[in-house]
């Protein structure tokens, strides 16, 4: 599950893309409950029937909106991971992109809704959702392999460690987006930073990091 929503910086020329951008903006500004085909039509100057022509169902609209937003964030993630800085610094950047900004983060709100609807989805839809998850997983695995090969990280099974790390991020991220009392983003970042230090690095950095608040 990815991080906070970011507005696209390029001009949107295709009608389908305009609808997806408008859907994400509606979720960010008004919440998922206010997202309707008729409302989107008014935003982009189309009839609800025209929008149904592109998407068919609201479930499909939500999934395509999620895919579109992940394309935007994926470009940002790849840019962050290609920087010429230590692997640990790039790992922190990936974590920052992954986590929600906080309560009711629109991208995470959309993720949770798509996850919930996937309980009754067909196999093809679930595969499309899995592809979004695996994009993060592959980038995390590649970064771990690089860090181990350069001696920046302890030797770990990159696939297993990436799976466990994403589960940790998903758990903390869910706490943040639902507004679990006593949970804030900086506290979560400290918890995750301690886990990564203890698991991947040795030496004074891990020992010197102040403990996370309970």
Can you say where each PLM-predicted feature lies in the sequence?
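N-terminal intrinsically disordered/low-complexity leader segments
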Residues: 1-14, 204-214
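Hydrophobic alpha-helical connector segments
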Residues: 64, 78-108, 161-165, 189, ...
